[in-house]
Amino acid sequence: MLYNLLYPLSSDITVFNVFRYITFRSAWALATALLVSIVVGPRFIAWLQRLKCRQFIHEDVTCHMSKAGTPTMGGLLIGFAVTFSVLLWADLRNPYIWLTLLVFTGFGFIGFLDDYTKLRRRNNKGLTASAKFLWQVGVAVAAMYLLVQLPAYSTKLAFPFFKGLTPDLGWLYIPFAVAVMVGSSNGVNLTDGLDGLAIGPTIVAGIVFSIFIYVAGHSQIAGYLQVPYVPGVGEVAVFCGALVGAGLGFLWFNAYPAQVFMGDVGSLSLGGTLGFLAVLCKQELLLLVVGGLFVVETLSVILQVGYFKFSGGKRIFRMAPLHHHFELQGIPESKIIIRFWITSALLGLIALSVLKLR
């Protein structure tokens, strides 16, 4: 909004020329979302407590019983901070901004329904898996249908580490991208089991994709680094800045011991958005590296369930997702969280190295 209001005046007031720089607005989007989260956070948490929006703990995770009653649906705080900051600092004429907000709010709405169902039933049973999946696919298909209508966007798939290997998937690109978004959404959701565990890697991924998106939207840099050029997509770096800022602000209250949990309204929206960011900058396959922690957590659940069925009741892990396995081994929660954050940061650095390793 500020860009649309003030930048046109830059010919008369030269200081407003600074608004044309995406890096400037991304930095301020980060700062704004962070400040909004920290300022609004205490009152928001108190509001959740008054509404009795409290976390119900799965009975199998006995070591978490002390967390019962902690306010949940903190993802609404993230959603407010991100949306406010993006509307303030982004170029609102850019279609990629509105599509990203559509995905962010769409997946967030699914998470809200899931959380609300749990609160009404007063247990941790929300939407059925099939209902949640269908909602996720619906939002992802709608977003992808609108995205491929944009003339500047292509259905080519880029392969990391390989120059010029960009096959055009045609109509097959839509189901592929939908799978990326839905898988990412569920991956973050499964990882959100310890205080600050999911938001840390999400912040790392937000930083990494802000760089990839800025590069993809800059013709000269994209050409030099030989990454797919997507005209206009660089503006989404402002959204990434807001996402990182809101994530840091939420971590202020979600760090161990957590004062609030993000709930599915947070994890589903963040995961779906990370998947969409990967799609926007044509780094869908690289999401496996950037979000490697989410991939491992998801695979641990798939392997556990599959092995349990085919082995007649045996298990690979003491409990899935993987972070619960480490908990049952006696590793302190705070140590698990920090180690996962470190792993996520290393994966982020590996992903960024792809910019030169071609």
From Swiss-Prot:
Subcellular location: Cell inner membrane
Record PROSITE patterns: MRAY_2 (PS01348)
Catalytically driven reaction(s): UDP-N-acetyl-alpha-D-muramoyl-L-alanyl-gamma-D-glutamyl-meso-2,6-diaminopimeloyl-D-alanyl-D-alanine + di-trans,octa-cis-undecaprenyl phosphate = di-trans,octa-cis-undecaprenyl diphospho-N-acetyl-alpha-D-muramoyl-L-alanyl-D-glutamyl-meso-2,6-diaminopimeloyl-D-alanyl-D-alanine + UMP
Main location: membrane
Pathway(s) it belongs to: Cell wall biogenesis; peptidoglycan biosynthesis
Gene Ontology biological-process entries: cell division; cell wall organization; peptidoglycan biosynthetic process; regulation of cell shape
HAMAP family (alphabetical): MraY (MF_00038)
The protein, known as: Phospho-N-acetylmuramoyl-pentapeptide-transferase
Gene that encodes it: mraY
